[in-house]
Amino acid sequence: MYPHRRADMNPISEFIRGITKDNPTFGLVLGLCPTLAVTTSVENGIGMAMGTLFVLVGSNMMVSAIRKGIPGTVRLPVEIIVIATFVTIVDMVMEAFTPDLYTSLGVFIPLIVVNCIVIGRAEAYALKNGVFYSIIDALGEGTGFLLVLILIGGIRELLGTGIIDPFGMTLINLSGVINPAMFMTMSPGAFLTIAVLMTIVNYRRQQKAAKGG
């Protein structure tokens, strides 16, 4: 699941692996706290995922670049410092340029520091692979996380409000067609949505495995 550099590795397969097989939510089952908390809308999902993607790329790149010079006794503290540096950049940029989104995401922006996805990729991949492939891994995992948060946020926002309108752009408006279920924008809706999606994903994987795929 977390390979060292192999002769048969290529950037495209590594990128796709992060979106599909090792998807942070449906493959590795990591980072569920922000996934549950911030996916009340597509806008929130995009904001959190883009921030996490930036931190993933930056921390993977930096950890991979300095990995041979990090003593084992201080490995984790060094990784946390690196991650916290990039999270601070995200926090300051969001506060300056997207204040409404910054307020909406709240404490979950600084909590990216301890997001299992970011720490997990630094530990399991960046420490064992070169800079280029560590960046590719981060892009794949970050893109997979982005797609999942958009999907979950879209489902919850549509069923909870009848409208999907990220950043003021109305993409779907079914307010006059469906009766919004407000609980979908609350915690029970988050658990229900993720449970249904995980059930579908696991069922499809079992079907594929049964067919020898």
Curated annotation (Swiss-Prot):
Biological-process GO terms, alphabetical: electron transport chain
Assigned EC number: 7.2.1.-
Membrane spanning stretches: 25-45, 46-66, 77-97, 100-120, 135-155, 181-201
Superkingdom of origin: Archaea
Location relative to the cell: Cell membrane
InterPro entries: NqrDE/RnfAE (IPR003667), RnfE (IPR010968)
Tagged with keyword Electron transport: yes
Lipid bilayer topology: Multi-pass membrane protein
Quaternary structure and interacting proteins, as annotated: The Rnf complex is probably composed of eight subunits, including RnfA, RnfB, RnfC, RnfD, RnfE and RnfG.
Protein name as catalogued: Ion-translocating oxidoreductase complex subunit E
Species name: Methanosarcina acetivorans (strain ATCC 35395 / DSM 2834 / JCM 12185 / C2A)
Gene that specifies this protein: rnfE
